[in-house]
Curated annotation (Swiss-Prot):
This is Toxin YoeB. The active site is at E46 (proton acceptor), H83 (proton donor). The keyword Ligase does not apply. Belongs to the YoeB family. It comes from the Bacteria. It comes from Escherichia coli (strain K12).
Length: 84
């Protein structure tokens, strides 16, 4: 499964690399798990609604979420900082 980062999510990821390596590790674990089982597993995956319909979220921390969408052959990371 191909991994695609939005510009915003990549900026979020770079922010975490500079400020909190534990969160980077957690994001990497969630991405690995999401690639295997996109709609179940770690981080309490849940489908998003309304203007984010088609996207899913997983908990990174109580405050931050990994927001993503899955297609047949790719995983789009939309955000990995703050709530949706």
């Amino acid at each position: 499964m191909k991994l695609i980062w939005s510009e915003e999510s990549w900026d979020d990821y770079l922010y975490w690399q500079e400020t909190d390596k534990r969160i980077v590790k957690k994001i990497n674990e969630l991405i690995k798990d999401t690639r295997r089982t996109p709609f179940e597993g770690k981080g309490k995956p849940e489908p998003l609604k309304h203007n984010l319909s088609g996207f899913w979220s997983r908990r990174i921390t109580e405050e931050h979420r990994l927001v993503y969408a899955v297609t047949d052959d790719s995983l789009l990371i939309a955000a990995c900082r703050y709530h949706y």
